[in-house]
Swiss-Prot record:
Keywords: Acyltransferase, Cell shape, Cell wall biogenesis/degradation, Cytoplasm, Magnesium, Metal-binding, Multifunctional enzyme, Nucleotidyltransferase, Peptidoglycan synthesis, Repeat, Transferase. It is found in: Cytoplasm. Residues 227-247 are annotated as: Linker. This is Bifunctional protein GlmU. In the N-terminal section; belongs to the N-acetylglucosamine-1-phosphate uridyltransferase family. Pathway: Nucleotide-sugar biosynthesis; UDP-N-acetyl-alpha-D-glucosamine biosynthesis; N-acetyl-alpha-D-glucosamine 1-phosphate from alpha-D-glucosamine 6-phosphate (route II): step 2/2; Nucleotide-sugar biosynthesis; UDP-N-acetyl-alpha-D-glucosamine biosynthesis; UDP-N-acetyl-alpha-D-glucosamine from N-acetyl-alpha-D-glucosamine 1-phosphate: step 1/1; Bacterial outer membrane biogenesis; LPS lipid A biosynthesis. Its cofactor is Mg(2+). It comes from Acinetobacter baylyi (strain ATCC 33305 / BD413 / ADP1). Mg(2+) binds at residues 102, 224. The active site is at residue 360. Pfam families: Hexapep, NTP_transf_3. Its EC number is 2.7.7.23, 2.3.1.157.
Length: 454
């Protein structure tokens, strides 16, 4: 049976008070709508139809690489009207899941259950039991069968005691959608076309409406303002933290951990507080990440220790490496095993060989460092001439003295030594001592100037 996913994403999101369309607001590093599209893809849906409206150009631009059919809702006349807009492109066979771009965290397994129960009845929905149902549509049942949805404002006092509510997520036969949607009426106080009216149509046709409830309440929570967005972010992050801990990761405080992408982990990984992981990252066995670190699209091999407040982006780190605190690995940083990168060292588009060290206050950009070399404090690779970047090559077992400037393009041969304070502008042969600085001048019995009395 074919599966279509219809995503309603046309709302403006006025309460967000943002120039950004609501469905593009980020949650865990991905737009709200991106979470829903990802789930639809996990279901192997045959069609994904997204209904856009406010900020439509921005929304389409954000997801231009996705295989999506876009349908415009020029006027926001209700949820029923939104789904009506899909009829010209909606298949006549199979089932459609109706989801929302601002309800981002409904899980694949929940929707698979909904598809399963709906396949025999032709219509199913997700409901939820809550302690305080105020403001939500109530599920009216007779002999445990759904008969109607009554909005809160229209509910009697007895009906308002019902704690089972409508989440708005449906699975409906496409044949029935083609039959029911044209019959929707806007004869109500709001003058809108309500999707909930298809429930009454199903009952009138003698269909039994299947229903399921999610395992986790936050799956069906929507986002209307920044408070709700922040609350859902924390719920989601806590679930991700729990999943990692169940896989053997030690998180010092699960409530102070953010995963904004995917993380592949080995055994006995330890992550301290306030660590942010973005994009696609991988941590090998026995890796330790200190407090306040940010990792983005980075792979760290087994046994490496990262001290607090280090930032990595598009970097690869070898085994048993020591990094930080306050180190920065920029895109193209590639560290071999047993490298030491210390405090306030920045590495960009540079490979560093086995066992080499840059322990203090150093910039290595567009460079190649061999094995077993020592880069002294304050060393700078001067890679930019104001127009172009140039490469510095440092061989194996090289010693670079403190406060040296290596003006690229330049190479330092294996076993060479550069004296402290040098500005190296020419290639240094292997096993050579090179130094370049002004001669030291001494003035005996020198008296510093005295401050003038006011």
């Amino acid at each position: 049976m074919t599966t279509t996913v219809i995503i309603l994403a046309a709302g403006k999101g006025t309460r967000m008070r943002s120039h950004l369309p609501k469905v593009l607001q980020p949650l865990a590093g991905r737009p709200l709508l991106g979470h829903v599209i990802q789930t639809a893809k996990q279901l192997n849906a045959n069609n994904i139809i997204t209904i856009f409206g406010h900020g439509g150009a921005q929304v389409q631009q954000q997801f231009q690489q996705e295989n999506i059919q876009w349908v415009e809702q020029t006027e926001q006349l209700g949820t029923g009207h939104a789904v009506q807009m899909t009829l010209p492109v909606l298949p006549h066979d199979g089932l459609s899941l109706i989801l929302y771009g601002d309800v981002p965290l409904v899980r694949q397994q929940t929707l698979e259950k909904l598809l399963a129960v709906s396949s025999t009845t032709g219509i199913g929905m997700i409901t939820l039991r809550v302690e305080d149902p105020t403001g939500y549509g109530r599920i009216i049942r007779e002999s445990d069968k759904i008969q109607a949805i009554v909005e809160h404002k229209d509910a009697s006092e007895q009906q308002r005691q019902i704690q089972e509510i409508n989440t708005g997520i449906y699975c409906v036969s496409n044949q029935k959608l083609h039959e029911w949607l044209p019959k929707l009426s806007n004869n109500n106080a709001q003058g809108e076309y309500y999707l909930t009216d298809i429930v009454a149509m199903a009952v009138a046709d003698g269909l039994e409406i299947a229903s399921i409830q999610p395992d986790l309440a936050f799956e069906v929570e929507g986002v209307n303002d920044r408070l709700q967005l922040a609350a859902l972010e924390r719920e989601f992050q806590l679930q991700q933290a729990k999943s990692l801990m169940q896989q053997g990761v030690t998180l010092t405080d699960p409530s102070r951990f953010d995963l904004r992408g995917t993380l592949k982990i080995g055994q006995d990984v330890r992550i301290d507080i306030n660590v942010i992981i973005e994009g696609n990252c991988e941590l090998g066995d026995f890796v330790e990440i200190g407090a306040g670190c940010v990792l983005k699209n980075t792979k760290i091999a087994a046994g490496t220790k990262v001290q607090p407040y280090s930032i990595f982006e598009d970097a690869v780190v070898g085994e048993n490496t020591q990094i930080g605190p306050f180190a920065r690995l920029r895109p193209g940083a590639h560290l071999a095993a047993e490298v030491h990168i210390g405090n306030f060292v920045e590495v960009k588009n540079t490979s560093i060989g086995v066992g080499s060290k840059a322990n203090h206050f150093t910039y290595l950009g567009d460079a190649e460092v061999g094995a077993g070399s020592n880069i002294g404090a304050g060393t700078i690779t001067c890679n930019y001439d104001g127009a172009n970047k140039h490469k510095t090559v440092i061989g194996d077992a090289v010693f670079i003295g403190s406060n040296s400037s290596l003006v690229a393009p330049v190479s330092i041969g294996d076993g060479a030594t550069v004296g402290a304070g040098s500005v190296i502008t020419r290639n240094v042969p292997e096993n050579t001592l090179a130094f370049e600085r002004a001669q030291q001048i001494e003035k005996a019995n020198y008296q510093r100037p005295q401050k003038l009395k006011k």
